[in-house]
Amino acid sequence: MTTAELHYKIDWRASGHYPGHHASMQKGGGLQFRNHAALINAPDPRRFDVHASLRDPFEQVQVRVYRQTSAIPVYVIADLSASMSFVGASAKMHVMADFVAGLSDSATRTGDRFGFVGCAEATSDEWLLPATMNRAAGAELAERLRAYQPRGLSSQALLSAADSLGGRRALVFLVSDFHFPAPLLAQVLSALAYHDVVPVMLWDRHEHERLPRFGLVRVFDHETHGSRLLLMRPGLRRRIQERFAVQRKQLFDVFAQHGRLPLLMEDGFDADEVTRYFFG
């Protein structure tokens, strides 16, 4: 199976020592000029700067110092609660699996490490992948997700997911349908504030927009965390659509308060859509 190619970027300087693709705070062999330094402090005569040396009031030999490009950790924190079992135009877990496959492949090609934390009412070692450069690990994880039927009773473990990310700042993709209370989302985003968080919102138009006017429809019940059959009628259809519109506004308000609008996927996984999110 061919993995769709996607691209991402960060707007901050990485602090890691490992060479990679991203702008960094580290000195090294990159092409971006950082500053001048005395040769005794930066002993690389190949970068001797005659003009800076002549201007130096202390008559010290000056060399150019450059920034290296560094690698970063890239994580997916995934909601594995029961609402993620919804199947409409496509299964939400299939969309997540495609996204994980594309992101893990892109990360390892870029020189970044990819990790994964799956969350429901609790975290589980079964769904914990420490950040790794092993491309096969991401592909194997994606296939497991594709076959998985989530049954989690809540998304509460998202609150503690940051504990599994390590001490370095990471680019974190928070993947969920966010069918849980807005105050919990605000707490989750606050817990992840140290990291660069991209919310990935997996909705399906068959959940709300493309409901039939009449007929039997299987819907997810947020109170029982299970599915049930409803006899759809125009009034019920309108109420469901209004509820989704209110929820969408609440979610976007919380995301905006934390400085990042979501990457919305309503029509399945599209690698180009992910790339446009970062590069416009």
Task: Please provide the spans of the model-predicted regions.
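An amphipathic, basic-hydrophobic helix/alpha-beta surface used to engage anionic
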Residues: M1-E126, L171-V175, P181, E207-H208
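Von Willebrand factor type A / integrin I
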Residues: M1-M25, G167-R168, F180, A186-G280
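Solvent-exposed, conformationally flexible loop/turn segments
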Residues: A42-P45, R135, D267
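A conditional alpha-helix N-cap/helix-loop micro-motif detector
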Residues: M96-A97, R151-S155, F244
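Von Willebrand factor
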Residues: N134-A170, P183, L202-D204
